Amino acid sequence: QVMPFMEVYERSVCQTREMLVSILDEYPSEVAHLFRPSCVTVLRCGGCCTEESLTCTATGKRSVGREIMRVDPRQGTSKIEVMQFTEHTECECRPGSTVNNGKRKKNPKEGEPR
């Protein structure tokens, strides 16, 4: 099945979208605990901008709570608690670092023998 151009375009633009984030990525100091689930959904900015020099950037944020089970394997205990996560509310394409597949773009002459 082929998705029509306008639907492809509308889905790809810079906007908030539901994404999974790892709790340990958001709370790296909590490595002594296990979390269930280990990731949560939050709205985050993502998508393509019309120019490569622009980056889809959050221009509005808020804190949202998610109930998570925190397990302490050393003590054999667990409890459900509310943890806070940053959620994006607005996005814009703004000038930013030029990134290509997670790596900085190299100057064409960089790394070449002189």
Swiss-Prot record:
GO terms for cellular component: extracellular space; membrane. The modification Pyrrolidone carboxylic acid is found at Q1. Keywords: Disulfide bond, Growth factor, Pharmaceutical, Pyrrolidone carboxylic acid, Secreted, Toxin. It comes from the Eukaryota. One of its GO terms (molecular function) is vascular endothelial growth factor receptor binding. Its main location: secreted. It is found in: Secreted. One of its GO terms (biological process) is vascular endothelial growth factor signaling pathway. Residues 92-114 are annotated as: Disordered. Snake venom vascular endothelial growth factor (svVEGF) that may contribute to venom dispersion and prey subjugation by inducing vascular permeability and hypotension. Induces an increase in capillary permeability after intradermal injection, as well as a drastic hypotensive effect after intravenous injection. The hypotension is mediated by nitric oxide (NO), which is produced by VEGF-activated endothelium NO synthase. Induces angiogenesis and migration of human vascular endothelial cells in vitro. Belongs to the PDGF/VEGF growth factor family. Snake venom VEGF subfamily. Homodimer; disulfide-linked. Interacts with human VEGF receptor 1/FLT1. Interacts with human VEGF receptor 2/KDR. This is Snake venom vascular endothelial growth factor. It comes from Crotalus durissus terrificus (South American rattlesnake). The lineage of its organism: Eukaryota, Metazoa, Chordata, Craniata, Vertebrata.
